[in-house]
Amino acid sequence: MSMFNKVVKEFQWGQHKVRMETGEIARQAGGAVLVDVEDTVVLATVVAAKSPKPGQDFFPLTVDYIEKTYAAGKIPGGFFKREGRPSENETLTSRLIDRPLRPLFPEGFYNDVQVVVHVVSLNPEVPADIPALIGASAALAVSGIPFNGPVGAARVGYKDGQYLLNPTRSQIATSDLDLVVAGTERAVLMVESEANQLSEDVMLGAVVYGHEQMQTAINAIHELVREGGKPEWDWAPAAKNEPLIAKVTEVALPLLQEAYQLRQKSARSQKLKEVSANVAAALAEAGVEADKVEVGNIMFDLEAKIVRGQILNGEPRIDGRDTRTVRPIEIRSSVLPRAHGSALFTRGETQALVVATLGTKSDEQIIDALAGEYRDRFMLHYNMPPFATGETGRVGSPKRREIGHGRLAKRALIPVLPKEDEFAYTIRLVSEITESNGSSSMASVCGGCLALMDAGVPVKAHVAGVAMGLILEGNKFAVLTDILGDEDHLGDMDFKVAGTDNGITALQMDIKVQGITKEIMQVALAQAKEGRLHILSNMQEAMGHARTELSAHAPRMITMKIHPDKIREVIGKGGSTIQALTKETGTTIDIQEDGTITIASTSTEGMAEAKRRIEGITAEAEVGKIYAGTVLKLLDFGAIVNILPGKDGLLHISEIVNERVKDIKDWLKEGQQVRVKLIQADEKGRLRLSLKAALAEEGGSISPINAGESAAPAAPAGGSEQQ
């Protein structure tokens, strides 16, 4: 009899066979599920503390998605040969798992919960993020931890008018859509997507299709729980302190209502601090002992009630706008004189300074992904220092939020970038958030597009982004355009839509409550389009098209092609030739395996010289052609003459003139410029030259050295050639 109480569930899910099992591996974890999708295998585990930490006022959920290199049959690089800090993909996938799980933990549950997902086997054609999300949901479901799941997830592609369920990597590469949707049986909770300018209807259809298809996985998790689940925790939220709620409400409600009539964020924030101080003083005067965390939660509920009530009753929003109005926009381009491209995009109290830098092929980011190494020619980095919100804080390496916001903005811009054969530059965008009051990632999209255009990148269209919110109470709802930070915090849905005049390029949706219908999402997407088109009109007015000239400080670039067999000649022994070329011409030279050479420099003269010299190095000597050569060395029986870079031939003593030559030094000297004809090239590459044949063909003459300078015309420097 086995020591394991193993439960296995298998099901067909689109083109993939899925296997979920629990009860064998990681039995001391609160919950552990192994998910196998066509040889992509993840181990998802969850552990929760039995009680919250004293004074805990938030839900401490941690999600760690970890890719093990052995999953792809690799040994890690570096000195220590161990997996190091999380890659960008690991960070983004951790966020992808976190976002749909977090809203499903019950209110008031403040115990530490840690979800850890290990990728232990990888089929390069099957991405691990969907199995990881399904596994994390299943591990929570079997653990008995308070959780209103399970959650299902699906990836949706779109090609030739058809939706694709969980497409392979090869299919994603040719798809017009890469969308991940997660949710419960009843509702969608999270959407993350990149699209090739698709309509709102197609995007909404993909969300609905993904939600329908994920039910297969949700049903399988239910079956797994029935057979292998642990008992549910005996947990209930702490009883509400009604007397405290009444006292805080009595003191705070009128003051909070006053605070939310202040339209400026700084004034409102100051007023809210005063309200908190007044409440604390009133409680102390009344002799009420209250936990600071508990009072803070009551205050938050009151703020939410005020803001949400005002909006649903048709009153102005926090800053005085109606539900559809976008904040005032100001745009300035070419902000930084030495940058290749820059733009300052300001929308209300949110501001992004976005800077574009152009580089060469050698500047591409080399990403050693689990599925295989690849190069990325477009980078977008998002930074939000603490001063952007008027606070102090840590400045340093990017946090998960910054990495996630940067990736969203990048997704929005990728569909409008020119192809590499149209614009060979490596592009880096950096978005510096200098002010923030909501929607900074969408400001990065707008500013990023303008910075690209300012740098002379021929983007296909303007791209704008807008952050939307939603307030839902029973059958009443209101969709908010261009939300503030407080509206994001107090609302039920945060979704960001970016795109062009022609369609959506990126969509990110996070829903905090269940009950948002297809019809509500339809209204929200239509209102988002209205806001996006308004922002696009402002951007088009500020900058109608990309600059036709690159910045004077940006590198110029030319591309040429040589035969792959000639690459080693250009590189030279130990890289000597190419190193000399780059140093002497002041250029950067990149050589691809197919023989494509990219020469970049801020000097057009340097590029032209480098190209000319490479053409000389790779040129083939042709029999019958006359070359301008240089005498390198004199021999008793002739001379060695260089006719092309790296191409030397023998000028035999009998091929100098038609008469008998007793001493070659009477006719030639080292360093002398002569015109010679290539008369023979054997299979070993040895060249035979003739001076007298060239003289006869061109009608020239040569005299002995002691009779004066050679009559042969001097060849131009660099070895030009003539038929």
Curated annotation (Swiss-Prot):
Keyword entries, A-Z: Cytoplasm, Magnesium, Metal-binding, Nucleotidyltransferase, RNA-binding, Transferase
Catalytic reaction(s) noted: RNA(n+1) + phosphate = RNA(n) + a ribonucleoside 5'-diphosphate
Domain S1 motif: 624-692
Biased composition range(s): Low complexity: 707-723
EC number of the protein: 2.7.7.8
Cell compartment(s), UniProt: Cytoplasm
Ligand binding (Mg(2+)): D488, D494
GO biological process, one term: RNA processing
Molecular function in Gene Ontology: 3'-5'-RNA exonuclease activity; magnesium ion binding; polyribonucleotide nucleotidyltransferase activity; RNA binding
GO CC terms: cytosol
Principal location: cytoplasm
Residue ranges of domain KH in the record: 555-614
Region (Disordered): 701-723
Enzyme superclass (EC): transferase
Family as reported in the entry's similarity comment: Belongs to the polyribonucleotide nucleotidyltransferase family.
Official protein name in the record: Polyribonucleotide nucleotidyltransferase
Organism: Cupriavidus taiwanensis (strain DSM 17343 / BCRC 17206 / CCUG 44338 / CIP 107171 / LMG 19424 / R1)
Lineage, opening ranks: Bacteria, Pseudomonadati, Pseudomonadota, Betaproteobacteria, Burkholderiales
